[in-house]
A protein has these predicted regions:
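His/Glu-rich zincin catalytic helix
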Residues: 23-138, 142, 158, 171, ...
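Bilobed periplasmic-binding protein-like "clamshell/Venus-flytrap" ligand-binding domains
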Residues: 8-27
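Histidine-acidic residue clusters that define the catalytic metal-binding segment
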Residues: 1-14, 62-80, 214-254, 279-286, ...
Length: 437
C-alpha cells in the first residue's frame, strides 16, 4: 500500500471508469402508467414430506462420522483472583499473542440514561495532553484498539491488541477517562448526529416494527420511548457528561483478561487499580404488561404489509431450553419449519412467515410467543387464518419432528465454545441462573 501513489489511483480510474456504467433513476410520485393484473388465484401445493428423490436417497445412505460434543469445564478453564475490591477472571489464549482486557460494569442505561450519551461524546474528545486524533494515533502506535459497549444493565470497556502493550493501553485508557477535556463544539455536533439518527430511525421499517413490539410488551413505559428529549440534550452541559466519564474509575467493576501470562498481568495491573468510592444507582424498572389482544397499527408507505402477534408466556425456566429449541426448529423457524412450508411453499400466502418462542434474559422475566407474517395486503386475511389454524391445531408429522430433534442435537454437538466465549457464555449463564440482577 505504501508504494501506491496518487497518480496510480488516477491512472486506474481513467482506465477502468469510463462509459461502462448503468444509470438507474428512481422517480418519485404516482405511476400513471401502472398496469394491474387480475389476481389469478393460487392452488395450494400438497407437500409430500415423505417422498425422497434418488439424489436425496443417495445422500442419506452415505455414512458420515458422528460429531462428538465437547463440553467446557468452566471451573478449570476460567481462573479467578481478587486484587483489592476487583474480581479478575482469566482465560488462557492458546492461539496467538493478541490479548484482550475487558472492564465489566454492572451499570447500564437502565441505571443512568446519560451514560450512553457520555460515552458517545467521549469518542470525539481529547485530553490535556492529546487531541482526539492524537489519542487514536497513540493507541495505534501501541497496536491497541478500544471499544465501549453500553447495554440496558451493564457496560463493557474493552482493549484488544499485543499482550506486551496491553498494560500501556490500559494506562492510556485511564488517562483518557480521567483527563478528558470538554468541548462544546464536539458536543453540539454529537447532539445533531443523535437527532439525525432518531429521525432516520422513525422512517426505518424494521426499527418501527421493533418499537411496536416493545410497545406491545411494555406500553407507554418502554425503553424505546424513554430517551433523553431534545430539550434536555441541548440544555445539558458537556462538563456534566465528562464528569460522568471521569467517575468510571471510581465505580465498581470486574476485569476479564484473555492472554498468555496471567502472573505478569496481575503484577502490572495491580498498581493501576483504584478502590471504588461510588455506588451504582438503582435501575429503572420497565414492567412487562399482560398482552390483552390489542391492535397497534402504523401507517407506513409500502407495497407489502407486515404483521406480528405477541403473546406473553410464562417466566423463564432454564429446564425448558431443549423443548423450546425443538419447537422452534420443528414448527416456527427456518425453511424446513411447518409454518414456512405451509404458508409460503404450499399456499404462497406470505413472502416470509415464522413463529418463535423467545426466551427471557433473566429468571424473573417472561418468555414471549411471537408470530410474523409478511405478505401482500390482499392476502392478509387468508394468511392470518392459515396461521391461526396451524397454531390451534399443531400438525403432528413424526418424520419432521425427529429431524427437528436431530437438528437441535447436532447444533449442540457441533458448537465449539472457544477463546473469550468461554468466559462470556459462563458470565451470562451465571447471571441468568443466579438471577443476580
Amino acid at each position: 500500500f505504501q508504494k501506491i501513489t496518487k497518480q496510480d489511483v488516477v491512472d486506474f480510474a481513467q482506465k477502468f471508469f469510463q462509459k461502462n456504467y448503468v444509470i438507474v433513476k428512481k422517480l418519485r410520485g404516482e405511476n400513471e402508467n401502472l398496469i394491474r393484473v387480475e389476481n389469478p388465484g393460487i392452488t395450494p401445493v400438497k407437500i409430500n414430506r415423505e417422498a425422497q428423490s434418488e439424489f436425496l436417497t443417495e445422500i442419506l445412505h452415505q455414512k458420515s462420522s458422528e460429531i462428538t460434543p465437547k463440553f467446557i469445564d468452566y471451573k478449570n478453564m476460567i481462573e479467578e483472583t481478587q486484587i483489592g475490591d476487583k474480581k479478575i477472571s482469566f482465560v488462557k489464549n492458546k492461539y496467538n499473542h493478541i490479548a484482550q482486557l475487558h472492564l465489566i460494569y454492572k451499570i447500564g442505561t437502565d441505571h443512568d440514561k446519560e451514560l450512553f450519551l457520555a460515552v458517545q461524546v467521549l469518542q470525539y474528545l481529547g485530553t490535556s495532553r492529546f487531541s482526539a486524533d492524537q489519542l487514536s494515533q497513540e493507541f495505534f502506535k501501541l497496536g491497541i484498539s478500544n471499544d465501549f459497549k453500553t447495554y440496558d444493565d451493564q457496560m463493557i470497556i474493552s482493549l484488544t491488541g499485543f499482550e506486551e502493550n496491553l498494560i500501556k493501553g490500559f494506562e492510556l485508557l485511564k488517562h483518557w477517562i480521567t483527563e478528558v477535556k470538554p468541548d462544546d463544539e464536539v458536543y453540539e455536533s454529537t447532539i445533531e448526529l443523535i437527532l439525525e439518527s432518531r429521525n432516520v430511525a422513525k422512517k426505518d421499517k424494521s426499527r418501527i416494527m421493533t418499537a411496536l413490539s416493545h410497545y406491545a410488551k411494555f406500553g407507554e413505559n418502554s425503553r424505546f420511548r424513554d430517551v433523553i428529549p431534545e430539550e434536555k440534550l441541548r440544555a445539558t452541559k458537556v462538563e456534566h457528561l465528562t464528569e460522568k466519564v471521569k467517575n468510571l474509575t471510581q465505580l465498581p467493576y470486574e476485569i476479564f483478561f484473555y492472554g498468555k501470562d496471567f502472573e505478569r498481568f496481575k503484577e502490572k495491573i495491580q498498581p493501576l487499580l483504584e478502590k471504588a468510592t461510588l455506588t451504582i444507582p438503582k435501575p429503572k424498572i420497565y414492567q412487562e404488561l399482560e398482552t390483552q389482544g390489542k391492535v397497534f397499527f402504523t401507517n407506513y408507505d409500502m407495497v407489502q404489509m407486515e404483521m406480528s402477534k405477541i403473546g406473553r408466556a410464562s417466566q423463564l425456566n432454564t429446564e425448558n431450553y431443549g423443548k423450546i429449541n425443538v419447537f422452534n426448529e420443528y414448527f416456527g423457524r427456518g425453511l424446513s419449519s411447518i409454518v414456512f412450508q405451509e404458508l409460503r411453499e404450499s399456499k404462497s400466502l406470505a413472502y416470509s412467515a415464522y413463529v418463535n418462542y423467545s426466551t427471557a434474559t433473566y429468571l424473573d422475566r417472561h418468555n414471549y410467543v411471537v408470530s410474523y407474517i409478511g405478505t401482500q395486503a390482499n392476502k392478509l386475511h387468508l394468511a392470518v387464518d392459515a396461521m391461526a389454524d396451524l397454531m390451534q391445531d399443531l400438525p403432528q408429522i413424526p418424520t419432521q419432528f425427529n429431524n427437528a430433534k436431530n437438528s437441535a442435537l447436532k447444533q449442540i454437538a457441533s458448537t465449539r465454545i472457544t477463546r473469550t466465549n468461554i468466559f462470556f457464555i459462563f458470565f451470562w449463564s451465571f447471571l441468568i441462573i443466579l438471577n443476580i440482577y
